[in-house]
Amino acid sequence: AGTAMFFYSGKAHCDKDRKNRIVRCVLSMMIFGMISLTGYMNGCAMSKQERLAEELDGQQPGGIEGKVYEIRQSGDEWRVYVYAEWITFGGGDSEETVEYRGRSKVLLYMEDVESLKTGMKLTLSCSLSRPDSADNPGEFDAREYYSHKGIYIVGKDISILECGEDYSRIGDILFRLRIKSGEIIDSVFGETDGSVIKAMLLGDKSGIDRDTKKLFQMNGIAHILAISGVHIAIIGMTLFGVLRRLTGSYMASGIMAISVIVLYGVMTGMASSTVRAMIMMVISVIGQVKGRSPDMLTSAGTASVIQALIDPGIILDAGFQLSFAAVLGMAVPGSLMKKLIPTKNKVVSTLVMNLAITLATGPLVIFYYYQFPLYSIFLNLLIVPLVSVIIFVSIGVIAAMLIFPGILQGNEMAVCIGAFPVKLILAIYRQLCEWAMELPFYSINTGHVSVMMIVVFYMAMVGVLILLVRAKSADCARVRRRMVCLCAAVIMTLCC
């Protein structure tokens, strides 16, 4: 709500026409009120679901009626996500039956999903409980993780009592395509490399071995395993550009590109970073169709408001925060650093932007993971440009195997040639990470930092960059005095 009001009131302030200023201010207040009311209602609904989950005492038998909205495989088991319309549990000799009617998300752990399809209504009995909480500091906290996604109850030992006949045809096609694509990736790229490709293309991280995940995390390149702005930009904007040249129409190519990206997001699970990138891409495409240039801060602000309205708990999710921190890093410190270091050299420009993103995301990385990969700036400079090659080649291999399964299945040479560039790049990634880990101070263990320290860092970073930019055109002595005062204030705040 604040983002929307800030944007529209800012536009109103810049408008020279008094009548337009009044209209924009009124519009901004109306939007603020509508968004605040919607957010409050969603927040109340989430609080009610959380209170319902708190009444669960360990594992309790219960029943659910609802609709399946996502099916995902995790190792040998399946995770079925349901929008429950009715939940009941308890009712033993000394227990009171608890009944809840209202839409809420429930996660079901199942061994077989052959009878289930996306969009299907079902009635089932199961053992209900809350997600497991962390016993030790630093341990994965499933309860907190799923609460950020609006899930407070999980079900096990499922017994399906009734299944509806209607289901989502599009959802089922996307589910089958995802499963088939995963099988192709495993058969072509092997188990180790295939797990990385599935994470990058399908959003499936369940198969990544612990060593690979730790190697990428310790070197600050684990973001390539999540479907984010890089992936959406590569796929969506490339598709938009190709279709625009083929059709000659901004409108037709925009509609087709947006449709493909939305379907791709649904197929891969609609992670927070994926949704953010999708919304920003849609705004960018609409802007180009209308002949206007998109603004990164406006697009990011709109995406954050939409996501927070749909799921208020997502603002506490680490992936959500890191995703928007990276965008804000490019928009704020990135633009300021470009003014400080004006250059036409693409390598230097990319290095400056990587530094800006690292400055923006670094405090959050330290806050959540208690360590900072020192050489991630330089590793990302080498690794990110090759992501597009992995994506295009992998999509090409999957498409070829889907279109010509009979021809390519028996032709091992063609499959090996198609997979070679991807396997080579992933081998280079691993080797670069291993070399970086041999350098001194490759990963700095910082321990826990407070929220106040992060806020002070961001304020100091932006303040220093603004003062440095002004130093190029203002009185240097005055700027130096301001910088000394700013540094003294930061040190005093940190000491307190």
Describe the function of each predicted region:
Residues G66, T88-G92, D112-S127, G138, ...:
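Non-globular, low-confidence helical/coil segments that flank catalytic cores
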Residues A199, G203, I258, L424:
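Short acidic/histidine-centered micro-motifs embedded in hydrophobic/aromatic stretches
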Residues A1-L52, R276, L467-R480:
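N-terminal leader/targeting segments
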Residues G329-F441:
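Alpha-helical transmembrane segments of multi-pass integral membrane proteins
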Residues G2-G10, R210-I377, V393, V449-C496:
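Hydrophobic alpha-helical transmembrane segments in multi-pass membrane proteins
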Residues E183, K214, R244, I261, ...:
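Short amphipathic alpha-helical coupling elements at transmembrane boundaries
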Residues G66, C126, M200, S228, ...:
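Divalent metal-coordination and catalytic microenvironments
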Residues G33, L37-H223:
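Membrane-interface helix/helix-cap signal primarily in integral membrane proteins
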